C-alpha cells in the first residue's frame, strides 16, 4: 500500500531540484519509491538567495503495511537529512 507525504523547505538557491530528489531517494531506497518536485518558488516572503522547494514522497513497502509510527520515523529522517545536508528550513 502506497503512502504519500509532502514536504516544503526554504533552501539555498544553489541546490537544484535534482540534487534534492537524489538526496531524499538515498535515505531509504527500499521504501522510497518516488520523489517528485511539485513547486519551486522564489520571490515574495522568501529571502534573497533562497527558494522554496516542495516535493511529494511516495513510500511503498514491499513486505508490510506501514504503521503511523513508521511513517513518522521516515518523515523525520527526510526532514533531518535535508536540513543537515543543505541547511534548509522546513516551511510550514
Identify the meaning behind each predicted range.
Residues 1-92:
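A carboxyl-terminal module marker
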Amino acid at each position: 500500500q502506497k503512502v504519500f507525504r509532502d514536504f516544503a523547505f526554504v533552501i539555498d538557491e544553489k541546490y537544484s531540484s535534482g540534487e534534492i530528489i537524489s538526496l531524499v531517494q538515498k535515505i531509504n531506497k527500499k521504501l522510497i519509491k518516488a520523489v517528485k518536485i511539485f513547486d519551486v518558488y522564489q520571490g515574495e516572503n522568501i529571502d534573497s538567495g533562497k527558494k522554496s522547494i516542495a516535493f511529494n514522497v511516495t513510500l511503498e513497502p514491499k513486505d508490510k503495511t506501514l504503521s503511523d509510527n513508521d511513517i513518522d520515523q521516515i518523515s523525520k529522517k527526510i526532514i533531518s537529512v535535508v536540513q543537515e545536508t543543505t541547511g534548509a528550513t522546513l516551511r510550514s
